[in-house]
Amino acid sequence: MAITKYKAAAVTSEPGWFDLEGGVRKTIDFINEAGEAGCKFVAFPEVWIPGYPYWMWKVTYLQSLPMLKRYRENSMAVDSEEMRRIRRAARDNQIFVSLGFSEIDHATLYLSQVLIGPDGAVINHRRKIKPTHVEKLVYGDGSGDTFMSVSETEIGRVGQLNCWENMNPFLKSLNVSAGEQVHVAAWPVYPGKERQVHPDPATNYADPASDLVTPEYAIETGTWTLAPFQRLSVEGLKINTPEGVEPETDPSVYNGHARIYRPDGSLVVKPEKDFDGLLFVDIDLNECHLTKVLADFAGHYMRPDLIRLLVDTRRKKLITEADPNGSIATYSTRQRLGLDKPLSKKEGDETTDVL
């Protein structure tokens, strides 16, 4: 049965920098906290595990190499025991989880998100379609079968996007067309506009993301929009500074940017600069009607006979194989990574749950 009213939470906290195990433990702690608070849904920031590598915007190539090595070593495979522990935490708390993480698949990293159900199943697994600017130093592109965002669940049609994907008009159109009701606008960590230096545009600072892009997404799509953000501490600044470079000393410009918005774009909650934890919201899916009765860009307020979006969800592989019938064999990333398999009952248990 669909649940139309429930409590949800957005995480605004400091990740376990370069620390896969620490990040997993902190993730489970927040899932437990959200579950104890009565939440049906909790949303984490972009690449929460093992933290967003903001240092890549400030380092030279040679400075980046040891940091990249360490970052890759602490990124998480989606079919890993670390991910299964997180999935079990979701199941133990009977809660939906939107998790952003740096995914390692073979030798490439991706800015990935999963939507985990209250049974521990991975409902959706997606990868950011295009890393932003210097993010290409670290991450690869998502493929056709890993970029869809919206999933039908008992708490509504839930969508997820990473960072500047939230201002991509084509991705917004795609999500609107799926009837999205609850959206996770997952953001990383980056400074506020008080740190802006000419000619760097305001686009590249946290305030427009929090106070322009995110509420714009909410009002354009008519969705409850949760915007989890990472934070930084003095120690975090040191960890994210290459050896031999003097670290910044004031982390406050990086903090206080998480938000939650109603479907009409009005603000529900924003944290103080020093707040670290969960932001809560009481969601009523029926409130989406108040906005969508005025403007539903997937229905009465659109003209598909004039404007349409072409979407290609096929995976393009480097190596193709012939199947027994002589045509091209296909497989999905989801199947290859084992996400179609049920979750084991407990850590170390080889048996699986009944489907």
Curated annotation (Swiss-Prot):
<feature type="active site" description="Nucleophile">
    <location>
        <position position="163"/>
    </location>
</feature>
<dbReference type="GO" id="GO:0019500">
    <property type="term" value="P:cyanide catabolic process"/>
</dbReference>
<dbReference type="GO" id="GO:0030196">
    <property type="term" value="F:cyanide hydratase activity"/>
</dbReference>
<comment type="subunit">
    <text>Oligomer of dimers, forming left-handed helical fibers.</text>
</comment>
<comment type="function">
    <text>Catalyzes the hydration of cyanide to formamide. Degradation of cyanide may be important for plant pathogenic fungi in infection of cyanogenic plants. Also has low but significant nitrilase activity with acetonitrile, propionitrile and benzonitrile.</text>
</comment>
<feature type="domain" description="CN hydrolase">
    <location>
        <begin position="6"/>
        <end position="286"/>
    </location>
</feature>
<dbReference type="GO" id="GO:0000257">
    <property type="term" value="F:nitrilase activity"/>
</dbReference>
<protein>
    <recommendedName>
        <fullName>Cyanide hydratase</fullName>
        <ecNumber>4.2.1.66</ecNumber>
    </recommendedName>
</protein>
<keyword id="KW-0456">Lyase</keyword>
<dbReference type="InterPro" id="IPR000132">
    <property type="entry name" value="Nitrilase/CN_hydratase_CS"/>
</dbReference>
<comment type="similarity">
    <text>Belongs to the carbon-nitrogen hydrolase superfamily. Nitrilase family.</text>
</comment>
<feature type="active site" description="Proton acceptor">
    <location>
        <position position="46"/>
    </location>
</feature>
<dbReference type="InterPro" id="IPR037544">
    <property type="entry name" value="CN_hydrolase"/>
</dbReference>
<dbReference type="InterPro" id="IPR003010">
    <property type="entry name" value="C-N_Hydrolase"/>
</dbReference>
<dbReference type="InterPro" id="IPR036526">
    <property type="entry name" value="C-N_Hydrolase_sf"/>
</dbReference>
<feature type="active site">
    <location>
        <position position="128"/>
    </location>
</feature>
<dbReference type="InterPro" id="IPR044149">
    <property type="entry name" value="Nitrilases_CHs"/>
</dbReference>
<dbReference type="Pfam" id="PF00795">
    <property type="entry name" value="CN_hydrolase"/>
</dbReference>
<keyword id="KW-0378">Hydrolase</keyword>
